[in-house]
Amino acid sequence: MTLQYQGEQYGKSTTFTIRIIGNNLSKSSSNYQIDLLVGDKKLPTFTSEIHQSLSNCLKEIYLFRKHNGITFNESSEKIVSLYVPYDKVLYNYNKYALFRA
């Protein structure tokens, strides 16, 4: 699932893309990897680990944003790829981790 947000980095307006990659390695568990892009450029987040929960992936993006002067406009969210409905439900349930105060 790929989402885009309008936002700013150090006061400069730009579009940020979040690409969520979920890999079902077994029927009982999923692993998630998340990429943050500005344009076509992938930003290096703190870890490159595969997380066992989507919530942990989103927390990592939040911490990266906080330390790199990045803000997202939550109302500008746009899904730009095909997605499984369950992925959207799971993302909506966990996205509080991305928009902490």
Language model features: what each stretch is:
Residues T14, I20-P44:
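Short aromatic-glycine-(Arg/Gly/Cys) micro-motifs in beta-strand/loop hairpins
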Residues G39-A101:
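Mixed-charge, Lys/Arg-enriched low-complexity segments
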Residues M1-S13, F72-S75, V80:
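Negatively charged, low-complexity tracts enriched in Asp/Glu with abundant Ser/Thr
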Residues Q6-G11, D35, S53, Y93:
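Compositionally biased, intrinsically disordered low-complexity segments enriched
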